């Protein structure tokens, strides 16, 4: 490994040369307090910035044992350090001058949720930060003096005040770690208390706006109905009270604009931990919860939707259903079956975004269209089977059909943003207004042995990133382009993820794209099932984190860990 003085000498030797001379800087350099690695150098000042990495020895960083003791605490610590580092480099970005992206210093900007990210990793041995730097130029001529400012003046100060415990706010570090431990304690107690979700008293559920996930100011704080109030004993905060939603079928009702969907949205994002001050720190949902909706036009491949749809007029086999252009009802049926395969124990649905004919059939419609002419068994007739025979609970927001009262174990009415337990009232009314129930065919767990296939359209030969020579005996390379949280292009096709409402960060999408790319290039062989491929990927993630997704030995700083449910959802939308 070279020294920082070697880097300074090289910089001065290439000053005023043509921009490609910057590539001679690739490598690692020992600074006094850390190792600086230049992993990738941009082709010109207008291209995507260069990839740079800083590695700090964990002993030198000297974080206390309570913050380093397990994966959970290290994730919370990494999140806090990354936010601090982002704030530090924000003071220096574009202070170095030049053309194009010259002087840019950027790193992942975290949202309200705490995610495992490659931008900052903490383990027992070291702390690693990955970020981007726009190497300065005048036109396309190297301006090494400006890069020297970044690497020898600005960056050392950012590292000093971001990754060394003695220079940080000890209270903030402790608070972040203790919050993570308290949040995990709630997750553990959900199972112990027979709950699928918990919403703490005084939680703030509404968000600032449709484009901001910050808490709304002057909003109505959440208050649990007494009949649903439970107490969580937390290791640091002690007793915390709030509304516990029990296993089974829960119905959320209420007038328009009274907070039904706001509560459901908070619950669907309760699969993630939130930062202090978010208002949803203790809105905690079963981590396998899956938000479902209809998706007209989605791709479905070999899914057993027979528990919901049978005897199609075209004679199509619904035990192995495939389509390039699903209807609202078939897409939602497939989503439920795929969610079961992904191990979800809780389904979240909103009547507003569901296919009406999939959810319910009223008595009048049953009279007009007899059951033998209707291939769809509505969700209303299957929700109880899903819970009693498959152990899957449901939380459903409804605003138009009263039929759902008849299957609900718990009914919560949102009244001016406050929840009211009206279960007893609803059950009494059900006796006064009975409904005609269709007798569905016997429930059977769906068949699930779907082989994963691959599409090599758009694949290119792998080349050595230094010489450009084709690499022999290596799998072809699929090009990948991420489009925010909407999806990604892989090869010549697009994977549409717009309706995965629990996919919250573009870096999760980027990671999903890389996971699919890795699977297609290394795991998919025409024999493995989707489940087997996901299990193998999960083993890799558990063993080495997202580092195994490195390309040309370079780990991107732009990945965030998705849940296994989103992995399944992504792979199920891969059109092959």
Range-by-range predicted roles:
Residues 1-185, 189-194, 205:
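N-terminal accessory targeting/assembly segments
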Residues 164-220, 290-291, 297, 316-320, ...:
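Long, charge-dense accessory insertions within large macromolecular proteins
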Residues 206-241, 276, 284-289, 293-300, ...:
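N-terminal pre-Walker A segment at the start of P-loop NTPase domains
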Residues 240-272:
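Glycine-rich phosphate-binding P-loop
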Residues 298, 308-329, 360-376:
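Flexible beta-alpha connector loops of hexameric P-loop NTPases
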Residues 320-354:
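Phosphate-binding/switch loop-helix module in NTP-utilizing enzymes
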Residues 340-383, 387-388, 397-428:
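Conserved P-loop NTPase nucleotide-binding/switch module
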Residues 388-391, 397-576:
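Conserved NTP phosphate-binding and transfer environment spanning the P-loop NTPase/kinase superfamily
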